[in-house]
């Protein structure tokens, strides 16, 4: 019986700092789009430049993390799973099952806007809708110099994150634990919690019960 196979020609994208600088970081975007097209990629370690690297490599700008750029385009989830090898004993002997960490790959600090505050003044969050109406939220009344950072996320992306976590748990037969600082971040982090719970109740509660795993 002949097996059908699909072959993909190797495509190489140089994400070294020199080439990223030559392409104004377009090569990073191109590599992410290729990953979306072909559904698979292997990425080597890259450098996210700081001020010292900008000077060392004579960069045009302080480019953002290539990992962050790629993950944002893929709207993916980062799963950090242990590699279990016979003969390599776990540091905590009582841990008998693997622990996998899932992290949302879109938005947050990777897509944040930042500003240095030079002197006393007021910092606000401002949202302007398509009709020009504004909503304002005070961040802080500065008495002197400081810093601020603005982060965002998208409900659609959070929903995709939730489904990828639930599906991964079902595929690997692992309990899923949700963790966030919703007691402090009552809107930002709590939105994650609410979306996860809503999707679980509607689409995954019965599947988890059938698989013998739990969502906490």
Predicted regions and their residues:
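Active-site rim loops that border cofactor/substrate pockets in soluble metabolic enzymes
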Residues: 12-19, 192-216
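N-terminal glycine-rich phosphate/adenylate-binding segment common to multiple enzyme folds
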Residues: 20-130, 134
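Active-site pocket-lining segments that scaffold enzyme catalytic pockets across diverse folds
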Residues: 152-201
């Amino acid at each position: 019986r002949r097996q059908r196979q699909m072959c993909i020609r190797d495509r190489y994208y140089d994400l070294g700092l020199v080439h990223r600088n030559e392409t104004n970081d377009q090569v990073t975007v191109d590599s992410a789009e290729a990953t979306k097209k072909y559904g698979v990629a292997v990425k080597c370690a890259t450098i996210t430049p700081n001020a010292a690297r900008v000077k060392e490599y004579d960069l045009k700008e302080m480019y953002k993390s290539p990992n962050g750029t790629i993950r944002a385009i893929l709207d993916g989830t980062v799963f950090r799973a242990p590699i279990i090898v016979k003969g390599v004993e776990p540091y905590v002997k009582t841990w008998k099952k693997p622990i996998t960490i899932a992290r949302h790959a879109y938005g947050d600090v990777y897509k944040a806007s930042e500003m240095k505050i030079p002197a006393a003044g007021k910092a606000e969050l401002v949202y302007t809708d398509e009709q020009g109406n504004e909503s304002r939220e005070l961040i802080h009344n500065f008495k002197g110099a400081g810093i601020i950072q603005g982060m965002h996320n998208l409900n659609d992306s959070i929903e995709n994150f939730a489904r990828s976590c639930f599906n991964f748990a079902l595929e690997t037969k692992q309990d899923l634990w949700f963790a966030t600082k919703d007691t402090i971040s009552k809107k930002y982090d709590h939105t994650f919690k609410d979306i996860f719970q809503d999707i679980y109740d509607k689409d995954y509660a019965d599947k988890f019960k059938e698989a013998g795993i739990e969502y906490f």
